[in-house]
């Protein structure tokens, strides 16, 4: 079990590299991964179930014990990224499918990998977990509503169909995982080290399938999507960090907020595009590329934030 736990930790730490490797393999060996697109919602549900299994009742206590930071993170999550997505789509004059995909990414809750990145960065992990929980539990209403408002100029959006999709692939699996952890907490604790493995494998399968199916399209518009995705992610982290500074939030908490804002549950964006926008097949592409990029940028950002006390002291001088 210890070896499996170490293997799970290794995969979680280097998920960005692993996603890139499997994406390259899927690009050239398309038949080996194309089948996974039929099970996108299943894989995401499994990943969210794995996340639910890691959430304890104490995590909810932390949420209520620090409402200010949680509220700031929540508002930043669901305003900064959606607005940036809409602005980029307008400025870059993106085709309908790609614009829809970018907006879907922007309107999703924080990604599960953000907690790991916050830990590596020396950020406030408890705050990161609290923000992920609140944004995820609110996603069944907030995400469809934002997509309906922002993407309605490009395509017809069925609000209630999206609500049902998010409930099925996010809310139900997460709540089921929380319930099982609450009832059988001691047993779950024994396998806690391998739980991230569930999410890693699921996300890798989702992205590999999207790459395999859209390999030809990636050649024609991949650089455009990559550029938009990079701007989206970096602007999100930068503005999130800037907002935290303006509000005089402590260094480690600001780090967690910036990471949480910039890193999205892009797997959900892919799932929603697959289930609700069949007529727009390329809408899955921004989510797939975002999944690769935000793990790379998140790791680099984590290294910068953890670089030393001088950075922290300089930050404190600015915020005081």
Outline where the language-model segments fall.
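Alpha-helical transmembrane segments of multi-pass small-molecule/ion transporters
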Residues: 1-320
């Amino acid at each position: 079990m210890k070896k499996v736990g170490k293997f799970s930790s290794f995969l979680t730490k280097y998920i960005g590299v692993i996603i890139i490797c499997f994406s390259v393999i899927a690009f050239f060996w398309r038949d080996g991964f194309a089948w996974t697109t039929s099970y996108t919602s299943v894989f995401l549900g499994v990943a969210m179930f794995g996340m639910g299994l890691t959430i304890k009742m104490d995590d909810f206590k932390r949420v209520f014990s620090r409402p200010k930071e949680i509220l700031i993170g929540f508002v930043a999550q669901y305003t900064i990224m959606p607005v940036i997505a809409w602005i980029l789509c307008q400025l870059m004059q993106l085709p309908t499918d790609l614009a829809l995909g970018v907006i879907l990414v922007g309107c999703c809750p924080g990604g599960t990998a953000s907690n790991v990145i916050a830990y590596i960065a020396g950020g406030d992990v408890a705050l990161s977990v609290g923000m992920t929980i609140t944004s995820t539990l609110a996603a069944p209403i907030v995400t469809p509503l934002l997509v309906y408002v922002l993407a309605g100029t490009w395509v017809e959006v069925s609000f209630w169909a999206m609500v049902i999709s998010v409930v099925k692939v996010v809310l139900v699996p997460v709540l089921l995982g929380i319930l099982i952890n609450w009832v059988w907490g001691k047993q779950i604790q024994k396998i806690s080290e391998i739980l991230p493995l569930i999410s890693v494998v699921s996300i890798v399968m989702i992205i590999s399938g999207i790459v395999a199916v859209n390999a030809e399209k990636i050649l024609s518009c991949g650089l455009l999507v990559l550029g938009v995705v990079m701007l989206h992610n970096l602007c999100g982290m930068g503005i999130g960090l800037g907002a935290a500074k303006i509000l005089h939030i402590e260094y480690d908490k600001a780090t967690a907020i910036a990471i949480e804002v910039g890193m999205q549950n892009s797997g959900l964006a892919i799932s929603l595009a697959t289930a609700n926008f069949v007529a727009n097949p390329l809408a899955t592409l921004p989510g797939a590329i975002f999944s690769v990029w935000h793990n790379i940028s998140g790791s680099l950002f984590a290294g910068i934030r953890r670089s030393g006390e001088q950075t922290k002291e300089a930050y404190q001088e600015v915020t005081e």
